[in-house]
Curated annotation (Swiss-Prot):
Function: Microtubule inner protein involved in the attachment of outer dynein arms (ODAs) to dynein-decorated doublet microtubules (DMTs) in cilia axoneme, which is required for motile cilia beating. Functions at the initial step of left-right asymmetry specification of the visceral organs.
Pfam families: PIRC1_2
UniProt gene name: pierce1
Entry protein name: Piercer of microtubule wall 1 protein
Entry's localization field: Cytoplasm, Cytoskeleton, Cilium axoneme
Keyword presence, Cytoplasm: yes
Taxonomic source organism: Salmo salar
PANTHER family per UniProt: PIERCE HOMOLOG, PIERCER OF MICROTUBULE WALL 1 PROTEIN
Gene Ontology annotations of biological process type: axoneme assembly; cilium movement; determination of left/right symmetry; establishment of left/right asymmetry
Primary site of residence: cytoplasm
Family per record: Belongs to the PIERCE1 family.
Amino acid sequence: MGAGILRVIIMDSENYVETHPSDDNEAMKTSDVYKVDKNLPKRFNNPDCFQGYSTKINHPFYQTSSQIYGSKRPTVHEMPTTFNGSYRKFSEHMLKSGMFRDNGFNTSIEKSKITGHDTIPMFQDRINFNYAYDSGNGPKN
């Protein structure tokens, strides 16, 4: 008899824990141990699909605890039991409207290090501002 997997069954309603040794070599799923959501993606129900993130082996003296933790495969106890997908409401709005631009009234003069100390940068006018990079002397009017 080889080293089998210790299978744990947890019943939430009674707080009852039952353990059974498993002789078969089938992979343990999250749904075997915990009650999972019906909309849980398959990758969260099967932790064996994650192989760990570290492929390069470092000297143990220079390894951090995060590298050690990230190199190991997750167990069923570390996998999520529910999945709440994010809404794309903000992204869709930003796609249609664009990023926020501050077009407020500025009362102070902003000096630019690129065009020189005696010129005022023109942030909104990209075409006229770009040629200041070539000459280094600032906009010529």
